[in-house]
Amino acid sequence: MKRLRPSDKFFELLGYKPHHVQLAIHRSTAKRRVACLGRQSGKSEAASVEAVFELFARPGSQGWIIAPTYDQAEIIFGRVVEKVERLSEVFPTTEVQLQRRRLRLLVHHYDRPVNAPGAKRVATSEFRGKSADRPDNLRGATLDFVILDEAAMIPFSVWSEAIEPTLSVRDGWALIISTPKGLNWFYEFFLMGWRGGLKEGIPNSGINQTHPDFESFHAASWDVWPERREWYMERRLYIPDLEFRQEYGAEFVSHSNSVFSGLDMLILLPYERRGTRLVVEDYRPDHIYCIGADFGKNQDYSVFSVLDLDTGAIACLERMNGATWSDQVARLKALSEDYGHAYVVADTWGVGDAIAEELDAQGINYTPLPVKSSSVKEQLISNLALLMEKGQVAVPNDKTILDELRNFRYYRTASGNQVMRAYGRGHDDIVMSLALAYSQYEGKDGYKFELAEERPSKLKHEESVMSLVEDDFTDLELANRAFSA
């Protein structure tokens, strides 16, 4: 199937002014377009324009937007809906039907204006939002086009076994967009279409073998919006280097599964072992301390990290397992008293009310910081990683601590979601305890961590839209030619 390309006339009808990277994507006729762009660079907007163009320019076309989750798919789906409703006011030979809850959009095409006598429906174009976390639901369809959003987070098997076969009958096209996540299949597909020569941030660029069906596009966020470069460079000061390079620089980083890429900047301190405690320094009356408390149950360890807020160094770390709730709280109270009644930041999620009641009963000054979601965990860990890269994290020079930090990694779930956890059957109690403690630390550059509020999921509801407006375009074929290059 020959891919039609949208024209400037079509862009004008949408009120859309593509920047140079978006325009290159639209002008490409490759069957597999791979766009690796930084955040807020217009990937989703360009993808939505491509979908709308197909729905109008090729009556009867069938296409999907597929993302790691339905919430992510809904972003581009929603943009497509907005644009389709706008265009339906221009073309009286079309009728739009939206089923919001099912993420299903229909564009009915007629042989004359819909409200004209004898109007006959000649074709129906369909666009649907899909999630990659249920691959079996992607099988069996026959499609003209597919858009993959955040493709680097989707397992390759979902593409090869479920998605690509849907394009085989009609020789359909795929637009594969994402920020990079290491050197996975998205990286390999990107190299198959990259013809830009050697470029920093793209390993093996310049020596890669290309495929005639592929064309790739690459740009950091500041390449697209050069006037905002200063803002992006400022952001670099507040997020981990690895995250910045991937999310904004659109770099393919080979060691991206390691959460703490700044381990070489970690300050290691001599300590004295006293029972279950690793003591770097005893209490200093003129200093303020806080304790990050990660409680363990069953085979997990409980870890209490005492942070000197004046120096930014861990003064003491206590690690134990097999202790009852009462025993854990008793030890935490003793540790707090030994460091001037240091206040405690405690992860109370998943341990029930028993811990909170025990903390209250013991009169411990504590702030609950429940790590109740992957979002909260990621924010805490990212803050610790950022401080580490700045050389502002100091811990006892202990093999167990270093191994746990080194083995804390990014993983991809079967549904394509990225999670942080210990390697294999390892523990992450030390990591979480340190992250809780350092969430209270004001860095040497004045940076202070603040936990962002989680946004509630949007409610979905059934919605039906019918738009019939007459305009100069009265003939469907003429209308199609008007915005097809």
UniProtKB/Swiss-Prot annotation:
The record marks D428 as: Possible stabilization of Magnesium 1. Disulfide bonds: none annotated. The N-terminus contains an ATPase domain. The C-terminus contains an endonuclease domain. GO terms for molecular function: ATP binding; ATP hydrolysis activity; endonuclease activity; metal ion binding. Coiled coil: none annotated. Residues 256-438 are annotated as: Nuclease. Its cofactor is Mg(2+). The keyword Hydrolase applies. The terminase large subunit acts as an ATP driven molecular motor necessary for viral DNA translocation into empty capsids and as an endonuclease that cuts the viral genome to initiate and to end a packaging reaction The terminase lies at a unique vertex of the procapsid and is composed of two subunits, a small terminase subunit involved in viral DNA recognition (packaging sequence), and a large terminase subunit possessing endonucleolytic and ATPase activities. Both terminase subunits heterooligomerize and are docked on the portal protein to form the packaging machine. HAMAP family: TERL_T4 (MF_04146). Belongs to the Tequatrovirus large terminase family. Mg(2+) 1 binds at D294, D429. Interacts with the terminase small subunit; the active complex is probably heterooligomeric. Interacts with the portal protein. This is Terminase, large subunit. It holds the Pfam family Terminase_6N. ATP binds at Q97, Q99. Nuclease activity requires 2 Mg(2+) ions per subunit. Also active in the presence of Mn(2+) or Co(2+) but inactive with Ni(2+), Zn(2+) or Ca(2+). Cu(2+), Cd(2+) and Cs(2+) do not support catalysis. A motif (Walker A motif) lies at residues 124-131. Keywords: ATP-binding, Endonuclease, Hydrolase, Magnesium, Metal-binding, Nuclease, Nucleotide-binding, Viral genome packaging, Viral release from host cell.
